[in-house]
Amino acid sequence: MKDYTLSELLNRRLALLGERNNLSLLEQCLHGIERECLRVTATAELAQTPHPQALGAALTNGQVTTDYSESLLEFITPALKNPAETIDSLDKIHRFAYSKLGDELLWSPSMPCPLPDEEHTPIAYYGTSNIGKLKYVYRKGLALRYGKTMQCIAGIHYNFSLPEDAWALLKQTEDFAGDARDYQSHSYIALIRNFRRYSWLLMYLFGASPALDAGFLRGRKHQLEQHFDADTLYLPYATSLRMSDLGYQSDAQADLTPCYNDLVSYTDSLRKAVATPYKPYVDVGTHDQNGEWVQLNTNVLQIENEYYSNIRPKRATYSGERPIQALVARGVQYVEVRCLDINPFLPTGISLEQSRFIDAFVLYCALEESQQLASHECSNASSNFLAVVKEGRRPGLSLQRNNSPVDLKTWATELLEKITPIARLLDQAQGIDEHIKSIAVQQAKIDDASLTPSAQVLASMKAHNEGFTAFSLRQSQAHAEYFRTHPLSAQEQADFEAQAKTSIEEQAELEATEEVVDFDTFVGSYQASILSISN
């Protein structure tokens, strides 16, 4: 590889973190994974059964819950220092789930199985408490606004943080007027700006949804090609149709594109969106003709989490606290990377080698210079991302950098060269060579697009002469066999079962003891809570 010059700031920060007394800080980064997956029948139909009680209460179980649908599971690992332990934790949650799923399977890819009519796609249910009802009505609102089909897409969310001591160390050598908390938030927002610039690379390397079931787009205009079988649509050079404009799209959110110049402007833009009426939603109202709730409010966003983005600044919330309240009160604690497809060739949907690379990539985004995004840069970042998810493997594809065209492979190779010193530093801190190895694996994909997961999905479908559903079912069955033949130890199984039992008891206690407030009043108070925040 050609030797690319690193920025002065990146060099200085790497030298500081690489000092003997500071290197251990890189061992204290935290990694957490959330993996969504649909429950399906043995014949690849959406499971119509309720969330299995043996998995615990979705409202209160911290590791096994539901996302949009009663049939859409979400597995959540704790945030751990060693990513190998994070992946192992995710593996164990899968094994526990399979011990309780009977004949059902976990769907292997991000794009959903053939879905029933919308009325037969069950919304996740969280019981009779006011917070449980709020979560249910919020999901009814999502169905009203975007349709249920879109909400059945699954993904991997990757949570990453640097230790606070690392931010404090970096602050000492830099001219920053605010306090330690402000510097940390400022730095995470800078990370997010760089992520916006470079996240197209993750889509090329890890996108794994080049094809989908034709029913997903029923009644919608599209430019996909029919191939493999009558029920499969695809794009020949696509990396991630999940992250394309075929996935989540919203006219209401079209003008809501924070460019992450600082935490205040980010929280203000979201606060405005959850308080600003949007006429098409106003026309529908919050209740149907029978007086039943259909959405929490008629604003651009019902709640801040409705804003769909590839990465989010996050802060752990207290009970009853809203995400924006936590960010305003205590600043940014970590970032949540939300654009990763599930790899259908991997039982857990993500590998340790991928995790190692994401760590180095996100750390590069954190340590590299990050000027505020001008409007043309915001536009370029969005168009680059969209180009890669729809045709990232097209030979000779060009992206826009500084308003000039640049070959994808050239830019990708430059980025890997700049990420390499960070990978080396992570390896040095941990006494391994896995991060450098992960860089080599990614460079091979840049040199040969057939090695990318998206290309391998299409190659496997072609080799087996099968469409999207047959491929996905085959992978789902293979992963089910893996998990069912690798059960948890008796103690691990007992621990998960105890957690499930406790979660059911916690939900029952909440429903029995919560303050008697009618739901309309509860929703009103919840909405008012966001209007009272001051930065």
Swiss-Prot record:
**Which keywords describe this protein according to UniProt?**
ATP-binding, Glutathione biosynthesis, Ligase, Nucleotide-binding
Q: What InterPro entries does UniProt report for this protein, alphabetically?
A: Gln_synth/guanido_kin_cat_dom, Glu_cys_ligase, Glut_cys_ligase
Q: Which GO terms describe its cellular component?
A: cytosol
Q: Does Nucleotide-binding appear among the keywords?
A: yes
Ranges in coiled-coil conformation = none
Offer an example of a GO molecular function term for this protein. metal ion binding
Q: Which Gene3D superfamilies match?
A: 3.30.590.20
Reaction catalysed by this chain? L-cysteine + L-glutamate + ATP = gamma-L-glutamyl-L-cysteine + ADP + phosphate + H(+)
User: What is a biological process (GO) this protein takes part in?
Assistant: glutathione biosynthetic process
Q: What is its EC number?
A: 6.3.2.2
Pathway(s) this gene product operates in, as recorded in its UniProt entry: Sulfur metabolism; glutathione biosynthesis; glutathione from L-cysteine and L-glutamate: step 1/2
Tell me the protein family, please. Belongs to the glutamate--cysteine ligase type 1 family. Type 1 subfamily.
What protein does this entry describe? Glutamate--cysteine ligase
Organism listed in the record: Pseudomonas savastanoi pv. phaseolicola (strain 1448A / Race 6) (Pseudomonas syringae pv. phaseolicola (strain 1448A / Race 6))
Gene designation: gshA
